[in-house]
Regions:
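Hinge/capping helix and adjacent helix->loop/strand transition within the periplasmic-binding protein
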Residues: 1-54, 103, 107-114, 122-159
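Short helices/loops that flank or line small-molecule/ion binding pockets
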Residues: 26-31, 46-60, 65, 69-76, ...
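Extracellular/periplasmic bilobal clamshell ligand-binding domains
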Residues: 154, 172-206
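Glycine-rich beta-alpha junction loops
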Residues: 41-45, 63-67, 84-90
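Alpha-to-beta junction loops
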Residues: 8-11, 53-62, 75-79, 147, ...
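C-terminal lobe and pocket-closing loops
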Residues: 70-151, 189-192, 200-206
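Mature extracytoplasmic/periplasmic domains
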Residues: 85-91, 103, 148, 152, ...
Length: 206
């Protein structure tokens, strides 16, 4: 971590501007107090892995699936500096031995913690299933049960593993998702700060 913070102009590859991966990259660089970090957006999935392997970028904020798929832990080809629990409190036992600090440990103020909570919330939800207001409860319950059954179906689990190179599915079930949505900050100050990280302007001062 000390070497990372001492370096200037670290190139961080990320998804396109506005994507949750792009926002995570900018928020991480901000909270870790990196010196003049260069966020390089525009990469899609495997393209970023290739750029990282070629040395076109110095760092990336990667999902646990990406790390496991490329066996980066056992090969010891990269350094890990921090983790982002998504949602908060959900830990991956495969990385426990690394003893990584959570990114929230670097948040200094309530404002920064709210920013992080908003980022986590949007990242946790992914693609949401929405129903219009006043939808009868019995219909809501039917959809919830359908989601639960889908994600616990052995056929779904096997297909997921096949598509992700053996990664385990960790779905956010309906009631958990509702809790995450409810806890996303809605105050104007946090929203405006979040917009600055979602855009392509310079990172704000701390």
């Amino acid at each position: 971590m000390a070497k990372l913070r001492a370096a200037s102009g670290v190139r961080i590859g990320s998804a396109p501007v506005g994507h949750t991966g792009y926002i995570q990259s900018r928020v991480s660089a901000y909270l870790l107090d990196l010196k003049e970090p260069r966020i390089i957006p525009g990469y899609e999935n495997e393209d970023l892995d290739v750029a990282f392997a070629r040395g076109e970028v110095d760092a990336q904020v990667a999902s646990t699936g990406t790390v496991i798929e490329h066996d980066l832990v056992n090969k010891k080809l990269v350094d890990f500096h921090a983790a982002i629990e998504v949602p908060k409190g959900r830990k991956d036992s495969r990385f426990a031995h690394l003893n990584l600090p959570d990114i929230e440990d670097f948040a200094k103020t309530d404002k920064e913690k709210k920013l992080l909570n908003m980022m986590r919330g949007f990242r946790s939800i992914g693609t949401a299933l929405l129903l219009p207001p006043a939808t009868p409860k019995d219909r809501v319950d039917i959809l919830k049960e359908a989601v639960r059954k889908t994600h616990s179906d052995p056929a779904f689990v096997n297909e997921y593993r096949k598509l992700t190179g053996g990664d385990e599915p960790t779905p956010l079930m309906p009631d958990e998702q509702a809790k995450v949505v409810k806890e996303i900050p809605r105050d104007a100050e946090t929203i405006e700060l979040f917009k600055r990280f979602a855009g392509n302007g310079p990172l704000p001062p701390r």
